């Protein structure tokens, strides 16, 4: 059994990587005023691909319980499959449904990981919030796509969820990083 400090020293980097990916996507959706279909496909594909890669980097780390790796692998796989599907779609509505479905599946998988492992693995507690936000923002994208909303609205819904996930994971990752630095005697400031 590893101590919380040993776990923190291993998981903070992939958590911070996923936070940066989510924040970059979310902020991009805020500042691009007139995204077209191609921009929407590229942005969703990049977000899903880099989120899946960051999740894979996280779940393959030694302290992550082996049983927790299955649902997190499903989340990463749903996001990567979403990237492949997006390549073949040609309308904002269908792209929105596909991207939203990938976010929903990833969110459900994260909620399963949280429900099964929150007591034994402290970082798994983040999966409650990332899973809920993924589920709700993905569901929002699907509903908006089916109602005929355009790329700006669909990216905005997903981007809002990404900003929430990014901020949560940034706080979590920096907290784990600070614990490690404090124990090593290298923490400065607060």
Write out the residue ranges for each language-model feature.
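Hydrophobic residues within the alpha-helical transmembrane core of Major Facilitator Superfamily
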Residues: 23, 49, 56, 80-81, ...
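Cytoplasmic-side transmembrane-helix entry/capping segments in multi-pass membrane proteins
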Residues: 64-77, 122-131
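Hydrophobic alpha-helical transmembrane segments in multi-pass integral membrane proteins
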Residues: 25-27, 81-91, 134-151
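Membrane-proximal helix-loop-helix units in multi-pass membrane proteins
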Residues: 81-131
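Structural signature of hydrophobic alpha-helical transmembrane segments
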Residues: 35-50, 90-105, 156-163
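Membrane-water interface at the C-terminal end of transmembrane alpha helices
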Residues: 89, 112-123, 141-147, 165-180
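Loop-to-transmembrane alpha-helix initiation sites
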Residues: 123, 149-160
